[in-house]
UniProtKB/Swiss-Prot annotation:
Protein keywords: Developmental protein, Glycoprotein, Leucine-rich repeat, Neurogenesis, Repeat, Secreted, Signal
Misc: This factor is named 'Tsukushi' because its expression pattern in chick embryos is similar to the shape of the Japanese horsetail plant, tsukushi.
Tissue expression: Expressed in macrophages in inflamed wounds with wound expression starting 2 days post-wounding (dpw) (at protein level). At 7 dpw, expressed from epidermis and extracellular matrix in the wound edge to neoepidermis and granulation tissue and in panniculus carnosus under the granulation tissue (at protein level). After fibrosis, disappears in the dermal area at 11 dpw (at protein level). Expressed in the hair follicle during morphogenesis and the hair cycle (at protein level).
PROSITE patterns: LRR
Subunit note: Interacts with FZD4 (via FZ domain); competes with WNT2B for binding to FZD4, inhibiting Wnt signaling and repressing peripheral eye development. Interacts with TGFB1; the interaction contributes to regulation of the hair cycle. Interacts with netrin. Interacts with CCN2.
Function: Contributes to various developmental events and other processes such as wound healing and cholesterol homeostasis through its interactions with multiple signaling pathways. Wnt signaling inhibitor which competes with WNT2B for binding to Wnt receptor FZD4 and represses WNT2B-dependent development of the peripheral eye. Plays a role in regulating the hair cycle by controlling TGFB1 signaling. Required for the development of the anterior commissure in the brain by inhibiting neurite outgrowth. Essential for terminal differentiation of hippocampal neural stem cells.
Domain LRRNT: from-to ranges: 18-59
Induction: By endoplasmic reticulum stress and inflammation. Up-regulated in response to high-fat diet and this is reversed by return to a normal diet.
Disruption phenotype: Expansion of the ciliary body and up-regulation of Wnt2b and Fzd4 expression in the developing peripheral eye. Delayed hair cycle with down-regulation of Tgfb1 throughout the cycle and low levels of phosphorylated Smad2/3. Failure of the axons of the anterior and posterior parts of the anterior commissure (AC) to cross the midline, leading to an almost total absence of the AC in adults.
Native species: Mus musculus
UniProt xrefs under SUPFAM superfamilies: L domain-like
Protein name stated in the entry: Tsukushi
Lineage of producing organism: Eukaryota, Metazoa, Chordata, Craniata, Vertebrata
Primary localization class, coarse: secreted
Subcellular localization: Secreted
């Protein structure tokens, strides 16, 4: 794909030149490799007004910026023409879009990155992205209320998909139907922060690795809330707007989790270290900005792989293994401690042995 090749060629070296362009737009050609053997064109037609579309672009355009043009609608005719067939990146952010035609992106067969952030979109048509091999979709800062997971099925052939739905009004996600004609989306990174979820949405069967629910009014985490997400490695539940209650074994469905962010929850209610039961691979835990100080006893016993914990205000704890002054007896285990220190001060506090 063009974007992947573009990143690879950055390591080889590039030369940037200006090319003739449509009046008001800027066209920059970047050449790469030995003897300038490969070139990409970036076209910037931002901040010109709605009259700019449809705009003719060079045949080998890789990225088109149409942001901040007060565009109110996008359809197939706006994104049609010889130069659009090679587009790998399209920026439609900071416009006035309230709706998108289902076939708007149907001719963009190589599109990998799409930015629709900072618009007024209230709904997504079904199968709107199925014609493009998208790997990154930004829909943050819109007015979406209810979204179907099936809307993100793309022509990606199994490639990882990153979706940003943060800062919307979403209160419900519709799961992918079991008997759908199209396969489930390959979403590996999903940002749902600062929406209106009162419960963890049903995301089972998505190949998620990263999930953020920051800033939502979640009231509790049910033991089966993360069912079907065994591959998740990074979970962020920071700055939740409710009084979060963490029951015992609340993360038992996430055996592969490595990073857990619970920061910015001053009213977090604790149910003991059993909350983290089953998180045998967790390495980083962020409890900063919460009332969970001192750390619960037996924390390291439930989190054998834990390497660092953030607590209180600017306090960082790191895992240390103490061998002792003498050789250990056969069969004995080294003493594992959490050594905590203020990140703003050079003087470290004494270790807390758990």
């Amino acid at each position: 794909m063009l974007c992947s090749l573009f990143l690879l060629l950055l390591a080889v070296g590039r030369v940037q030149t200006t090319r003739p362009c449509f009046p008001g737009c800027q066209c920059e050609e970047e050449t790469f490799g030995l003897f300038d053997s490969f070139s990409l064109i970036r076209v910037d037609c931002s901040s010109l007004g709605p009259h700019i579309v449809p705009v003719p672009i060079p045949l080998d355009t890789a990225h088109l910026d149409l942001s901040s043009n007060r565009l109110e609608t996008v359809n197939e005719s706006v994104l049609a023409g010889p130069g659009y067939t090679t587009l790998a990146g399209l920026d439609l952010s900071y416009n006035l879009l309230t709706s998108i035609m289902p076939s708007a992106f149907s001719r963009l067969r190589y599109l990998e990155s799409l930015d629709l952030s900072h618009n007024g979109l209230a709904a997504l048509p079904a199968e709107i992205f199925t014609s493009s091999p998208l790997s990154d979709i930004n829909l943050s800062h819109n007015r979406l209320r209810e979204v179907s997971i099936s809307a993100f099925t793309t022509h990606s052939q199994g490639r990882a998909l990153h979706v940003d739905l943060s800062h919307n009004l979403i209160h419900r996600l519709l799961p992918h139907p079991a008997r759908a004609s199209l396969p489930a989306p390959t979403i590996q990174s999903l940002n749902l922060s600062w929406n209106r979820f009162r419960a963890v949405p049903d995301l089972r069967d998505l190949p998620l690795r990263y999930l953020s629910l920051d800033g939502n009014p979640l009231a509790t985490i049910n033991p089966d809330a993360f069912m079907g997400l065994a591959g998740l490695t990074h979970l962020s539940l920071a700055s939740l707007q409710g009084i979060l209650h963490l029951p015992p074994h609340g993360f038992r469905e996430l055996p592969g989790l490595q990073v857990l962010d619970l920061s910015g929850n001053p009213k977090l209610k604790w149910a003991g270290a059993e909350v983290f039961s089953g998180l045998g691979l967790l390495q980083e835990l962020d409890l900063s900005g919460s009332s969970l100080v001192p750390l619960p006893e037996m924390l390291l016993h439930h989190l054998p792989a834990l390497q660092s914990v953030s607590v209180g205000q600017d306090v960082q704890c790191r895992r240390l293994v103490r061998e002792g002054a003498y050789h250990r007896q056969p069969g004995s285990s080294p003493k594992v401690v959490l050594h905590c220190g203020d990140t703003q001060e050079s003087a470290a506090r004494g270790p807390d042995i758990l």
